[in-house]
């Protein structure tokens, strides 16, 4: 009997790190997010491409500037132009690192990323959102939406 050996090639991961104020650069936010991403990638057998770490340091996610004119916007253009392979995982500490915009724009950002075949890994939740996962588990989208609402609400306070 012939035995077939399959190799599961680890998926590529790209880290997105953001904090809102330049003052936070002198704290532990950057180091915490980087270490969390590395640990997450180890747990999920992802290969972290540290040459493509996306950073919006001192850029608020509240009004969407990070997605409109920050380094996140460069990533979004790259996925729309198919320069980032599908099945890549964008790893963020939490959804509020990705955006703190209003819920409509925030959910649009998340679904835009997923629709382009890029999965979103959440360090704090230890889960990976994919288009397939969300479609098969629609209540997870409701959970994600509550995180997006909370992130926006925290910025408005």
Predicted feature descriptions by range:
Residues 1-157:
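Short, structured surface patches at the beginning of a domain
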């Amino acid at each position: 009997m012939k035995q077939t050996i399959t190799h599961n090639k680890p998926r590529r991961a790209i880290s997105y790190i953001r904090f809102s104020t330049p003052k936070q650069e002198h704290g532990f936010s950057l180091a915490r997010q980087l270490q969390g991403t590395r640990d997450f990638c180890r747990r999920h057998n992802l290969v972290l491409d540290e040459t493509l770490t996306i950073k919006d340091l001192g850029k608020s996610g509240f009004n969407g500037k990070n997605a409109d004119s920050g380094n996140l916007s460069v990533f979004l253009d790259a996925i729309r132009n198919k320069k980032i392979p599908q099945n890549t995982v964008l790893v963020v500490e939490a959804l509020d690192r990705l955006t703190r915009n209003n819920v409509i724009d925030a959910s649009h950002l998340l679904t835009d990323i997923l629709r382009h075949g890029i999965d979103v890994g959440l360090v704090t939740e230890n889960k990976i959102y994919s288009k397939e996962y969300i479609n098969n588990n629609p209540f997870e989208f409701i959970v994600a939406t509550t995180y997006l609402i909370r992130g926006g609400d925290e910025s408005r306070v």
